[in-house]
Amino acid sequence: MPKYKHVEDILKIMRNVEQVRNIGIIAHVDHGKTTTSDALLAHAGILSPKLAGEARALDYLDVEQQRGITVKAANVSLYHEYKGKPYVINLIDTPGHVDFSGKVTRSLRVLDGAILVVDAVEGVMTQTETVLRQALEELVRPLLFINKVDRLIKELKLSPQEIQQRIVQIIKDVNERILTFAPDPEIAKKWLLDPAKGHVALGSAKDKWGITIPMAQEKGIKFSDIVEAYAKGSKDAIEELFHKAPLHETLLDMVVRWVPNPREAQKYRVPRLWKGDINSELGKAMLNCDPEGPLVVFINDMRLDPHTKRLVATGRVWAGTATAGKEVWLVNAQKPGKILQVSIYMGPDREIVDYVTAGNIVAMLGLDDARAGETLVDINYKDQAAPFEQLHYVSEPVVTVAIEPKNPRDLPKLIEALRTLSIEDPNLKVTINQETGEYLLSGMGMLHIEIALTQLKEVYGLEVKVSPPVITYRETVRKPGEKVEGKSPNKHNKLYITVEPLEKEVIEMIQKGEITDDQDPRERAKVLRDKVNWDADTARRIWAVDEENFNIFIDKTVGVQHLREVKDTILAGWRLAMKEGPLAKEPVRGVKVILWDAVIHEDPAHRGPAQLYPAVRNAVYASMLTDSPTLLEPWQKLDIRVPNEYIGAVTGVITKHRGKILEVIDMGGQARIVAAVPIAESFELPMELRSVTAGRAFWGTEFYGWEPVPDQLLPELIRKIRERKGLPPEPPKAEDFLGP
């Protein structure tokens, strides 16, 4: 089969948006997502059908091939005929492992529909729920593929009736979550899965067959025939199944029939996902997915091309047509840019083309200043430009290692490699410890960091030394602190500040993007008044929102002279104080900083950053230290499946590691244990769980949240962090910041 059978055909169809579908395949790790993708790719003439299932075509990083899990979200355009009509299906592969959920979120923004793959034996797991919730929040329509049905017959030896019960239960579980997570009850009702209509497929991605109820009726396939084929272990009968009901045909037919085309989808997705004026020319062009309108592209992926060593920006064209030479405005970066080349993806390779029209996925060269999450618009429309909402990732980087090259001469190469890695994956944070000069790499878990380290070795040829992993903590306050006076070094400026805990509901609203730094202040005040009963005056007086660490600055002063002129300087000082708290120089999280009064010198020479930064910092630190400051530590949620006889052993391991059991669910012979443990205690867990369950526990993990460190562990932990950072072991007291 020729490798690129259909590039010209694909381009022709892409122009007609009714014949385009943008889909992804989402799942819990190891439920068969990549194998399902391969079955689709074989059909598109990109892989030979014999290799599908073994080849893992979308996993084109060597790391992924070795670990057998998908890390980079790749994209490919497929060609499919349904009822005699040709369609282009843009398939975006999304990682299923929890450490990469940032990439999943970015991929979802460019999709209109998703095939949710669920393992028939394991059912709906934590990560299944997480990716489904993210898809629904991004208004991506889910369809269901229940994979590994052969395991129910071969391994669990279930009767046809028991298999039916298991399948009905999985559909019910998914539907319950659609009702819970869909942002709009109308959409939830419309998107509920109805197997009789063909919203659900069953099959085996490994054996490459799949059926829906309408298709089985049409082709005369009985479920009892499938059970018999596997029960007998008949290779011919299974091969026959593949010929009668090939998985690619079943899934792609389902996609064409039930996933909305880009124009239909943009009508309800744009108003919810884009922050601009829907009635502007840009807004109308996006609502109508108009290829003749001004260009708007949302970038979901930045990646280094291994051949050209240039950065490739991949994204979805929401309006207009992307062409080489097009001048654009980068809305978040607030910079102009120029597209030098446009192409479409065929697996890891890009095919250069003249143009890509609205509703399709494009890869572009030349936009080195862009980052994942950037919005590009035609430069002539920059006044109407607004970003798509900030993407909300589910986790935050919480594990850090220090790295240095084994050969000191490689340092410039390491710096460049780290810069590129952090562009490709915004969930990897690279920082330099100013005191020690170390390069610090932070990620969402040890697996996330290990993969980055492997890439340093394999892609960049770097040998590096790595420190043991360090957990990132956050500083916060438990009760409102006292009002304190912060003086500038020249004593001419005084700020009167208190620090209080920020309500949990407000932190969640910042996380979800309901409250942002650049929001219209009146709109923000209304949201806070209506949803969390803030009084109107306080809500209107918010000066800034720290979206990274969830803090708010409020100005409650009355009639202070010269305050407006130094507002930006005060806020810059506040942001610096939020980056490193007083206890252990860890970021400050979840606090309200209130400015009650101020004395500002009239001469600008006496009120610059060198004077005001220390005044803000000293006041914030002193107020935090007056009343019960503490550290928050990151926790991980575990979703464990285990035979019933091991429940006691598993709960024992969890509690030994300061964990808590959230629920235990009986699943008939198997138990599902949902638990949470501090990440600091999680490094040994996999080995211990395997040993106490004789290797029979499966589990998934995801970020659980931040919890206060127990008081009895706090002093020792603060001392350790301070010593590691080269600080005096004892934390400062409030009076240390209140100078004479």
UniProtKB/Swiss-Prot annotation:
Stored InterPro entries: EFG_II, EFG_III/V, EFG_V-like, EFTu-like_2, G_TR_CS, P-loop_NTPase, Ribosomal_Su5_D2-typ_SF, Ribsml_uS5_D2-typ_fold_subgr
Any one GO MF annotation of this record: GTPase activity
SMART domains (alphabetical): EFG_C (SM00838), EFG_IV (SM00889)
Modified residues (Diphthamide): 606
Disulfide bonds: none
Residues holding GTP: 27-34, 93-97, 147-150
Entry function: Catalyzes the GTP-dependent ribosomal translocation step during translation elongation. During this step, the ribosome changes from the pre-translocational (PRE) to the post-translocational (POST) state as the newly formed A-site-bound peptidyl-tRNA and P-site-bound deacylated tRNA move to the P and E sites, respectively. Catalyzes the coordinated movement of the two tRNA molecules, the mRNA and conformational changes in the ribosome.
tr-type G domain location: 18-263
Family according to the record: Belongs to the TRAFAC class translation factor GTPase superfamily. Classic translation factor GTPase family. EF-G/EF-2 subfamily.
Keywords, in A-Z order: Cytoplasm, Elongation factor, GTP-binding, Nucleotide-binding, Protein biosynthesis
GO cellular component: cytosol; ribonucleoprotein complex
Protein name as annotated: Elongation factor 2
